[in-house]
């Protein structure tokens, strides 16, 4: 198979509308000084934060120096596990603002619930920290744009946790799409078929000992505590999460847009609902969304199903791209296959991963945001397209959107849902 140069990869993986964002080659750790040790704080350590800790601790000259979590039980257990595994002490903090005051911290890695992502990242930029932030980078479109502005204003490195962008195979797949391997690519499909069980309705209950419930809620409106919210099922409540299209689906929305070389759409139509469980989830179990790009002659289809369901060409979670000479199947984060012509003859294929954490650290060390594989601009777009679909679903109608102004056309009701009511002092400001 042809070997790709850095110039090849850069041309293939940078959308024309975002041409400043380069896809780098991997930089060896020997390129940096032996004393150039990076100190990272991980904020939110109960879910994805565990992977963040593992990922950063596996890198040369990188130290996870601080763990931060609003649940003291989780925090102490996490610190104990860290010290046992790595044979070193780690600082602990309940309040992320204390972390940002620590001038010895070079970068923060944010793995909180969705409603905290953008504000935590904006505060970090304002404090002079570089940021790795889990997907989605924002809970609504407004705060995604504010995060882009903050990263620019404070000249910070901000990486989004969409690790498939660092996959060698996926970078190669995008290059094939750009070069016309499957012809004119007119449609991308994202599939999110994951088991999401009945969560019941546990009602309200006393706040567990050790949990700072006020700080957990942060920007969200105050509610009584429920075990249905903490620690994972907050995903299914609009105040904190964005449903599965804004959870797992961000990987797939991001890849749809990357592969089609498009930004935000002009029309959005979503339909779905709750059909399986009589539980207290607010977000849909099933969601089918169509995003149209009439000027480019392209369309994105996103499909969320909770199981049981068929696979699509072997894919449960992934993407399919359709062209006039064939189609491409991307299964997960590190694998692609192509099928060419009317007889669907097998074409180029590859399975190969990458290291998204290392890519972030390389960019931080080099002080060069162009090295990022998952830059803040694409983070905003991948999250915002999911938010647009959710708004269409919640309003029950097709919406018309102006991608340049990032607002709906003549629709006050829909535009009001591009942001949220914030709870002081946890406010994403208009001027960052």
Located regions from the model:
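Beta-strand-loop-alpha-helix segment that lines the small-molecule cofactor/substrate pocket
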Residues: 113-114, 118-166, 180
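Contiguous beta-strand/loop segments that form the cofactor/metal-binding neighborhood of enzyme cores
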Residues: 172, 181-184, 189-335, 342-432
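Conserved SAM-binding strand-loop segment of SAM-dependent methyltransferases
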Residues: 90-95
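N-terminal Rossmann-like NAD(P) cofactor-binding module of classical short-chain dehydrogenase/reductase
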Residues: 108-109
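N-terminal secretory signal peptides and thylakoid transit peptides that target proteins
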Residues: 1-17
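Pocket-flanking alpha-helical
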Residues: 50-54, 75-80, 97-98, 118-123, ...
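N-terminal Rossmann-like dinucleotide-binding module
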Residues: 13-85, 164-167, 256
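Hydrophobic or amphipathic alpha-helical targeting/insertion segments
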Residues: 159, 175-176, 185
């Amino acid at each position: 198979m042809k070997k790709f140069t850095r110039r090849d990869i850069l041309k293939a993986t940078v959308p024309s509308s975002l041409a400043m964002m380069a896809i780098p080659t991997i930089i060896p750790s020997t390129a940096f000084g032996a004393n150039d040790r990076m100190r990272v704080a991980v904020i939110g350590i109960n879910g994805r934060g565990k992977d963040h800790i593992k990922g950063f601790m596996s890198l040369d000259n990188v130290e996870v120096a601080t763990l931060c979590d609003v649940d003291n039980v989780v925090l102490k257990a996490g610190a104990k596990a860290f010290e046992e595994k790595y044979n070193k002490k780690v600082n602990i903090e309940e309040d992320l603002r204390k972390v940002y005051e620590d001038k010895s911290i070079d970068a923060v890695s944010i793995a909180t619930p969705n409603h905290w992502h953008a504000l935590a990242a904006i505060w970090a930029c304002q404090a002079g920290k570089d940021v790795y932030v889990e997907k989605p980078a924002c809970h609504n479109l407004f705060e995604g744009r504010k995060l882009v502005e903050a990263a620019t204003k404070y000249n910070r490195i901000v990486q989004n946790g969409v690790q498939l962008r660092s996959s060698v195979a996926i970078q190669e797949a995008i290059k094939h799409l750009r070069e016309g391997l499957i012809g004119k690519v007119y449609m991308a499909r994202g599939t999110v078929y994951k088991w999401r069980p009945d969560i019941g309705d546990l009602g309200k209950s006393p706040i567990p000992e050790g949990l700072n419930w006020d700080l957990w809620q942060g920007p969200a409106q105050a509610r009584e505590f429920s075990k249905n919210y903490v620690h994972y099922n907050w995903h299914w409540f609009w105040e904190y999460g964005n449903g599965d299209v804004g959870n797992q689906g961000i990987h797939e929305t991001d890849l749809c847009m990357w592969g089609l070389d498009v930004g935000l759409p002009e029309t959005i139509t979503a339909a779905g609902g709750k059909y399986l469980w009589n539980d207290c989830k607010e977000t849909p179990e099933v969601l089918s969304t169509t995003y149209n790009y009439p000027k480019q002659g392209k369309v994105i289809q996103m499909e969320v199903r909770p199981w049981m369901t068929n696979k699509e060409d072997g894919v449960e979670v992934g993407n399919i791209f359709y062209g006039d000479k064939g189609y491409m199947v991307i299964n997960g984060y590190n694998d692609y296959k192509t099928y060419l012509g009317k007889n669907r003859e097998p074409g180029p294929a590859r399975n190969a991963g990458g290291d998204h954490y290392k890519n972030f650290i390389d960019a931080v060390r080099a002080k060069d945001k162009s090295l990022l594989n998952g830059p803040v601009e694409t983070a905003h777009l991948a999250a915002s397209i999911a938010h647009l679909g959710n708004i269409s679903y919640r309003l029950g109608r097709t919406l018309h959107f102006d991608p340049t102004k990032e607002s709906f056309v003549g629709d006050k009701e829909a535009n009001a849902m591009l942001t949220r009511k914030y709870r002081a002092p946890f406010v994403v400001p208009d001027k960052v």
